[in-house]
Every structure is written in structure tokens, then in C-alpha cells.
């Protein structure tokens, strides 16, 4: 009986501590610059197309996209961040594993490249605070 009680207690403790970690959202953020003659409206339009393409693919249904841009600028007014949010790192990884040439999102990438050049990216984990 004692080994069963210990096992149940450990499983409960693990679940209590693991659940919040598993629920953390992840953002993949690309630093981008508009190409000459392009606007943030153009960037939003291709971002919408990218999101539609991503959501049409396996594991992309729950992705979200946003464009972040500075409102006070000391450098380039054409800089913005392209942000893809996934409900978990596992969801992002499963989607990214299907990201290949010939997929809808790869075609959307080519259209995005006509509007902006993106150099480098970072992954961010969001941890809610209560």
C-alpha cells in the first residue's frame, strides 16, 4: 500500500508542477525591415496570407500572428517584428517539422520576402504572472 501511495503522491506533485510549464505560450519573433516602397499595410496583408497558409497545414490550426512595430523610433522607421505565437513549444515544433518547400507556408514566405527582409529570429516563452 505504501508504494502505491508514494506513486500517487509523486504523480500528483509532478502533474501540479508540470501543467503550468506545458501551458506556456511560445513566440517565434523575426526582426524585419520593409523593402523600399512597401508599407506596414503591405506587411499586414502578407502576414494575414502567411497565417492562412499556416492554419491550412497540419499542426498550424492554433497558431497566431502579429506584427510589432515601434511607435517611437531612433533608428529605421521601416523596422518591425513578425511574431508567430504557438500555444506550446510542442505545437510549434510539430508545425515546424512540416514546414518544407512546396507547402502553403513556404509559398507564403516567398510573398513575404517581396515585402520585407527578415534577419535573425528569437524564441520567447511567455509565463503568466498572477
Question: What feature does the model see in each segment?
Answer:
Residues 1-2:
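N-terminal secretory signal peptides that target proteins for export/translocation
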Residues 5-16:
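Bacterial N-terminal signal peptides
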Residues 17-23:
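Sec/Tat signal peptide C-region and signal peptidase I cleavage site
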Residues 24-35:
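Acidic/histidine-rich, surface-exposed loop or edge segments in extracytoplasmic proteins
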Residues 27, 77-80:
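Short, surface-exposed coil-to-beta transition loops
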Residues 35-46:
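Short, surface-exposed ligand-recognition loops at beta-strand->loop->(often short) alpha-helix junctions
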Residues 48-64, 75-76, 83-122:
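An amphipathic, aromatic/His-enriched active-site/gating alpha helix that lines ligand/cofactor pockets
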Residues 68-73, 124-129:
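N-terminal secretory/targeting leader peptides
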Amino acid at each position: 500500500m505504501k508504494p502505491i501511495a508514494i506513486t500517487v503522491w509523486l504523480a500528483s506533485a509532478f502533474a501540479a508542477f508540470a501543467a503550468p510549464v506545458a501551458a506556456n505560450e511560445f513566440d517565434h519573433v523575426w526582426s524585419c525591415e520593409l523593402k523600399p516602397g512597401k508599407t506596414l499595410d503591405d506587411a499586414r496583408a502578407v502576414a494575414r496570407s502567411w497565417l492562412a497558409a499556416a492554419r491550412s497545414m497540419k499542426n498550424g490550426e492554433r497558431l497566431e500572428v502579429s506584427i510589432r512595430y515601434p511607435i517611437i523610433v531612433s533608428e529605421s522607421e521601416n523596422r518591425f517584428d513578425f511574431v508567430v505565437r504557438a500555444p506550446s513549444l510542442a505545437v510549434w515544433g510539430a508545425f515546424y517539422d512540416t514546414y518544407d518547400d512546396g507547402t502553403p507556408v513556404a509559398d507564403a514566405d516567398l510573398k513575404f520576402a517581396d515585402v520585407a527582409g527578415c534577419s535573425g529570429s528569437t524564441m520567447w516563452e511567455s509565463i503568466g504572472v498572477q
